[in-house]
């Protein structure tokens, strides 16, 4: 029991302390709640104020944007008005310049007329001497005034152009500044949206903190951390507010500056308008003065014409009457001749058209001729090439023929040598036959042999004559080399056969005469005959188609034939060279003509 009482006594003070602590904690929490509620109300009021300020700033920005748009519209309208005014003034200046040029021309005409009138004798013009200098001085003064005004107008035009250029530059600057303002407004709006989001986040955190109080020991630390966060947020909001106020002040100052600039621009435009109005007034005054001057000039011209007519009437009545009539007749004749002149002009135009057509046709014809000439040149070049080829072929053929003829000459020389040898042999045989003793033959009773010998000699003579006739025919006819070769082969065959017959007869005679003749004269004859016949056989064996033994005139005929062939070849070469020269000259002539035509076309 005592222990239980002691325990109750021990526990009761702890519970009392705990209760006291709980009461203190409740008091602290209630106090902090009150503080937090006060702070939250203050923050809410601040947030409301900030929202109002942001709304006011947005309205100000919208108003400024509207003002900028209005300023732009005004600038555009002012530019259009300035352009229209400048165009009008430029047109008026051009018209005034044209009128001024007309006035100067009329003044020059009047001065020339006055110079012509001054040539008239001074006795006829005594009363005009006093009026003309005064009028001339007035006109000169007015012209100088017009010139001075035109110079002033040119200077003012230059000034207005420079002013317009400056206005364009200012407009560009204003447009750039408006774009900068719009960009700044967009950046401010983004900043305001970010700050609104931060405030919404902080406002969402505050009731969560209020609704979730922890009874643990970490509540104090959390509260302090939250308080620090709130303090930092409040300081940031204050800084951003100060920045926004500074920026708003800057924007207001810039707007004031732009308003001042706009006012200055409006004042300048009003000045420009006033200047333009004064310019209009000056132009009107100038036009009035110009009209007055024109009227005065017309009056002066009428007076001068009247005075001239009076003087002409006074000086010569009849000629003055006849001259206008003559002038009228001339005018009527000129008026009547106008259709004729028009017809002549039409004829000239038609002639010009015909000449142009003829020129075009000639150009086409020349082009066709040039094309034909080019074709002819190509054809001639082709013919020249063919002729050169043919000439080369002919040269080759001539060379071949010359080689063949040289070979033929060599063969003819060999045949001449053979013919000489045969001839000497025949003469020798005839001498030998003449030297024989007839008594021995009579005693030997060789009647048949003598007959055979005479017949063989006659045959040889006949064959020699036939060969000479053949050579004469060859000289006269002048056949080709192939026919000559055939004839040479035939004559060679006949000569060879005759030679064989002569050898046979000699052998017979030698066999018959061996017992009754001395041994001294006959062996050399047989040796000579063998020696003379052996080269013929060897030549025939080596040259089977060689020409026969011919006389000395045959070589002359061959030489004559070769000389004629050479002459013909030279004549052909000369003809070919002349033909080639003519073709070259013709081509050069055509080329020169074509180049001249090209030059004429370029000219």
UniProtKB/Swiss-Prot annotation:
Q: Could you tell me which residues carry Phosphoserine?
A: 546
| Disulphide bonds in the chain | none
Q: One GO term of the cellular component aspect?
A: deuterosome
InterPro entries cross-referenced by the UniProt entry: Cep63/Deup1_N (IPR031470)
Subcellular location per the Swiss-Prot or TrEMBL entry: Cytoplasm
Keywords annotated in UniProt:
Cilium biogenesis/degradation, Coiled coil, Cytoplasm, Phosphoprotein
Relate the assembly described in the record. Answer: Interacts with CEP152; the interaction is mutually exclusive with CEP63.
Its function? Key structural component of the deuterosome, a structure that promotes de novo centriole amplification in multiciliated cells. Deuterosome-mediated centriole amplification occurs in terminally differentiated multiciliated cells and can generate more than 100 centrioles. Probably sufficient for the specification and formation of the deuterosome inner core. Interacts with CEP152 and recruits PLK4 to activate centriole biogenesis.
Q: What is this protein called?
A: Deuterosome assembly protein 1
The source organism is: Macaca fascicularis
Q: Which gene encodes it?
A: DEUP1
């Amino acid at each position: 029991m005592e222990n239980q009482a002691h325990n109750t006594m021990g526990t009761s003070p702890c519970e009392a302390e705990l209760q006291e602590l709980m009461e203190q904690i409740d008091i602290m929490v209630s106090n902090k709640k009150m503080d937090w509620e006060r702070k939250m109300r203050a923050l809410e009021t601040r947030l409301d104020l900030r929202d109002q300020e942001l709304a006011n700033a947005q309205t100000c920005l919208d108003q400024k944007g509207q003002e900028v748009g209005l300023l732009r519209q005004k600038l555009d309208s002012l530019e259009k008005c300035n352009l229209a005014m400048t165009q009008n003034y430029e047109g008026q200046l051009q018209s005034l310049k044209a009128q001024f040029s007309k006035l100067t021309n009329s003044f020059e005409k009047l001065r020339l007329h006055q110079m012509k009138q001054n040539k008239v004798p001074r006795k006829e013009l005594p009363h005009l001497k006093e009026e003309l200098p005064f009028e001339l001085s007035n006109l000169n003064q007015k012209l100088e005034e017009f010139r001075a005004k035109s110079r002033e107008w040119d200077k003012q035009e230059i000034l207005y152009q420079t002013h317009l250029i400056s206005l364009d530059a200012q407009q560009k600057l204003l447009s750039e500044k408006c774009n900068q303002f719009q960009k700044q407004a967009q950046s401010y709006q983004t900043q305001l949206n970010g700050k609104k989001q931060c405030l919404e986040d902080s406002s969402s955190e505050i009731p969560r903190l209020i609704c979730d109080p922890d009874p643990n020991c970490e509540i104090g630390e959390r509260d302090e951390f939250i308080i620090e966060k709130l303090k930092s947020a409040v300081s940031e909001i204050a800084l951003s507010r100060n920045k926004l106020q500074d920026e708003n002040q800057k924007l207001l100052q810039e707007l004031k500056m732009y308003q001042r600039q706009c006012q200055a621009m409006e004042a300048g435009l009003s000045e420009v308008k006033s200047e333009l109005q004064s310019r209009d007034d000056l132009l009107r005054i100038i036009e009035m003065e110009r009209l007055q001057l024109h009227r005065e000039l017309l009056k002066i011209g009428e007076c001068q014409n009247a005075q001239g007519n009076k003087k002409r009437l006074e000086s010569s009545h009849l000629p003055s009457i006849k001259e206008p009539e003559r002038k009228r007749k001339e005018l009527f004749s000129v008026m009547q001749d106008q259709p004729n002149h028009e017809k002549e002009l039409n004829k000239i135009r038609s002639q010009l058209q015909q000449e142009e057509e003829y020129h075009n046709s000639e150009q086409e014809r020349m082009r066709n001729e040039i094309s034909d000439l080019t074709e002819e040149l190509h054809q001639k070049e082709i013919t020249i090439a063919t002729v050169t080829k043919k000439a080369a072929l002919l040269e080759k053929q001539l060379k071949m023929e010359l080689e063949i003829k040289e070979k033929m000459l060599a063969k003819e020389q060999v045949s001449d040598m053979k013919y000489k040898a045969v001839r000497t042999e025949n003469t020798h045989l005839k001498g030998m036959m003449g030297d024989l003793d007839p008594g021995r033959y009579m005693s030997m009773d060789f009647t048949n042999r003598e007959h055979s010998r005479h017949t063989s000699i006659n045959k040889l003579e006949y064959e020699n004559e036939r060969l000479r006739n053949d050579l004469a025919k060859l000289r006269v006819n002048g056949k080709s080399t192939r026919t000559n070769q055939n004839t040479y082969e035939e004559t060679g065959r006949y000569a060879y056969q005759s030679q064989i017959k002569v050898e046979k007869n000699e052998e017979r005679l030698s066999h018959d005469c061996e017992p009754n003749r001395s041994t001294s004269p006959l062996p050399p004859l047989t040796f000579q005959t063998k020696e003379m016949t052996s080269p013929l056989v060897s030549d025939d064996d080596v040259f089977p188609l060689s020409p026969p033994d011919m006389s000395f005139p045959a070589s002359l005929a061959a030489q004559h034939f070769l000389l004629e062939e050479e002459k013909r070849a030279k004549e052909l070469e000369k003809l070919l060279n002349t033909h080639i020269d003519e073709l070259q000259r013709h081509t050069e002539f055509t080329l020169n003509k074509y180049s001249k035509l090209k030059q004429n076309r370029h000219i």
